[in-house]
Amino acid sequence: MQEIENLHQSVLLQEVLQAFTPLEEGILIDCTLGLGGHSKAILSQKPHLKLIGIDKDKFAQEIAKERLKEFEGRYNLLSGGFAKRFKEALEIHGERIKGVLVDLGVSSLQLDDDNRGFNFRSHALDMRMDLESELNAQKVINSYPVVALEKIFRDYGEIKEYKKIAHKIAERRAKKPFKDAKDLSEFLSSLSKNKKIHPATLVFQAVRIEVNSELEELKEFLQCARNLKEAILCVISFHSLEDALVKNAFKDYAKNCICDPSSFKCACSNNHALGAILTKKPITPSPEEIKNNRRSRSAKMRVFQFKP
């Protein structure tokens, strides 16, 4: 377990603790429990707070359970997609929920596991958070029609040469299907001379988002989160697509006027804000944190306070 403690560093940990400083009692929902780093720190500081932890990855959840064993009786762990499980928890617990945390990153344990397919040297082409899910990266890369590959590379990877890459992948797989992440990574490297970013980075991002329906799940969650009352919502994102969804949702939550934009005059009483944005700009890791944990460098945290 000490090895896990050393391997896994929770991103923006002190900033998360600061965001939840007002919480004393009630329930905190950690929508992306992972290895339980954030939850463990919060429970340590908040003796009267209870936790609901959610994660798709049952292996990670077992590790989190072991790390949280000193808080036995104060937490309940749920398996599955966080949008669905959060909605269920909100229906059951309602206003007892005082804090919600969503960390959209992939854990170091998942990234470094060569059997999971998240890194460029993996012996698998998988990328599933939920190992019971039918869709994996191999099916996407070796089976998706070219037009479908173009779409996910464009929409989820924001890749400029999305058509070229999709067609090159299709040409190669027709001769020899891709067998693992290392095979795909090396092939993508042969197509690009980009020195600033590994040629496979954005393709891997796009495929991972597709395999795990990441953006759709985030959209569903943000819509459901509108029903929170007197709760603090903290979301950590790791790329521009996620951050844009969170930023726009928070702006929407904070709108007083809900009239049609084309209206000449407000007719809605102009008092419909669900609360206030607590972060005018996203909170990012300090230079020291980035030095100690390079994978934190793209993290952005936004916080919203819902009113009663």
Curated annotation (Swiss-Prot):
Family: Belongs to the methyltransferase superfamily. RsmH family.
GO terms under cellular component: cytoplasm
Subcellular location(s) of the protein: Cytoplasm
Native organism: Helicobacter pylori (strain J99 / ATCC 700824) (Campylobacter pylori J99)
Transmembrane segments: none
Entry function: Specifically methylates the N4 position of cytidine in position 1402 (C1402) of 16S rRNA.
Protein name (Swiss-Prot/TrEMBL): Ribosomal RNA small subunit methyltransferase H
Gene: rsmH
MF terms in GO: rRNA (cytosine-N4-)-methyltransferase activity
Binding annotation for S-adenosyl-L-methionine: G36, G37, H38, D55, F82, D103, Q110
Keyword Calcium: no
Reaction catalyzed: cytidine(1402) in 16S rRNA + S-adenosyl-L-methionine = N(4)-methylcytidine(1402) in 16S rRNA + S-adenosyl-L-homocysteine + H(+)
UniProt KW Methyltransferase keyword: yes
Annotated SUPFAM superfamilies: Putative methyltransferase TM0872, insert domain (SSF81799), S-adenosyl-L-methionine-dependent methyltransferases (SSF53335)
Keywords: Cytoplasm, Methyltransferase, rRNA processing, S-adenosyl-L-methionine, Transferase
A Pfam family reported for this protein in Swiss-Prot or TrEMBL: Methyltransf_5
UniProt-listed Enzyme Commission number(s): 2.1.1.199
